[in-house]
């Protein structure tokens, strides 16, 4: 079964209650933030979540271009997590290639979702090693 369930803050009226229900079932929780949503909307809830998923493309289909305006959102979330000594991880999904990977890691991302760039890489092994070597 699922060990972690992530849901979008934009569609859930009471994210904390939902997170508590999931945690009571032994499931880790994640909350997702769409590119157009203000990061301030999710910050007050991070203490209740194991993961913040920042969408860097609009949800729906692969191969979209990275939306640059998510970088300051990542930085704000990382500052909030560090300031409050939270264990919440930051994951990013959408438009991540070998050039953007280091930028988002520098901004505070812990987990990268990479699809099109990996599958389109001429040398997937080299691509994977490059991404694995990234350090904040």
What are these language model-derived features?
Residues 2-89:
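Conserved anion-binding
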Residues 7, 114-115:
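Short beta-strand and adjacent tight-turn residues that come in two discontinuous sequence segments
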Residues 58-60, 95-99, 118-119:
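Short Gly/Pro-enriched loop/turn and capping motifs at secondary-structure junctions
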Residues 31, 113-114:
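Hydrophobic residues in well-ordered beta-strands that form the structural core
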Residues 37-49, 94-112:
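Catalytic cores of alpha/beta
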Residues 1, 108, 115:
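Active-site-proximal glycine-rich helix-loop-beta segment
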Residues 105, 119-136:
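C-terminal helical cap(s) of enzyme catalytic domains, especially alpha/beta-barrels
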